[in-house]
């Protein structure tokens, strides 16, 4: 709406989270929405980074006073921050830090993940997030994969393939075409190391 400098943005600039009372950012404590915006982008919009960049370029010459997204608050005060978050995420620019996502059947791959985390910490990396993919909501795992620059995936071999929850995660990552990550992988096995081979192919 040109005369009001207002845009109805659909899924763009949205976030997860209920509106507890107010509906505009000036009526709400917005602290809880920033991480939920990253989770929302990662899971709903993440595949479309190039399209988001194209849309942001079109908006760069337009004065915007209000953003009405399909999900989340109406943005009035925090427009610059909201656009900045979407700009960074759609460029696939991760923060310094490492996500270790792993599946484990008997605890051995989990032990490896914990040892890797200890070594990373010993080498000065402070932002380290471990995710056991068997027990965690994948939307939060994707959120952190979009957030941080380093990604390490570990899997035991399961029926000559990846552990199912790990395989699902790799498919979700591939669907979103996540770029600009430093990637490593590890695995555990006895008689067949197929999981490591599959992760090497995924890399």
What do these predicted regions represent?
Residues 1-69, 75-77:
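Metallo-beta-lactamase
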Residues 9, 70, 101-103, 186:
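Short hydrophobic segments within beta-strands
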Residues 66-97:
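Terminal amphipathic helices with adjacent charged low-complexity linkers/tails
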Residues 109-113, 117, 166, 196:
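Short, highly selective alpha-helical patches that border small-molecule cofactor pockets
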Residues 130-136:
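Short gly/ser/thr-rich secondary-structure transition/capping motifs
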Residues 136-203:
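Helix-loop-strand module that forms the ligand-binding subsite of alpha/beta enzymes
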């Amino acid at each position: 709406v040109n005369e009001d400098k207002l845009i109805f943005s659909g899924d763009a600039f949205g976030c997860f989270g209920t509106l507890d009372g107010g509906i505009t950012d000036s009526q709400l404590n917005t602290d809880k929405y920033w991480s939920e915006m990253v989770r929302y982008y990662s899971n709903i919009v993440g595949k479309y980074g190039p399209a988001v960049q194209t849309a942001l370029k079109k908006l760069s010459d337009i004065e915007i006073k209000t953003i009405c997204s399909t999900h989340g608050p109406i943005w009035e005060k925090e427009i610059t921050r909201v656009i900045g978050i979407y700009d960074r995420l759609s460029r696939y620019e991760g923060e310094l830090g490492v996500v270790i996502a792993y599946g484990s059947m008997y605890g051995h791959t989990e032990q490896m993940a914990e040892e890797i985390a200890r070594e990373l910490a010993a080498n000065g990396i402070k932002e380290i997030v471990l995710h056991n993919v068997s027990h965690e909501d994948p939307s939060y795992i994707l959120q952190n994969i979009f957030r941080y620059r380093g990604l390490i995936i570990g899997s035991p071999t399961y029926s000559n393939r990846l552990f199912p929850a790990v395989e699902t995660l790799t498919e979700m990552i591939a669907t979103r075409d996540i770029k600009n990550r430093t990637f490593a992988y590890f695995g555990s096995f006895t008689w067949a190391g197929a999981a490591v081979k599959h992760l090497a192919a995924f890399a």
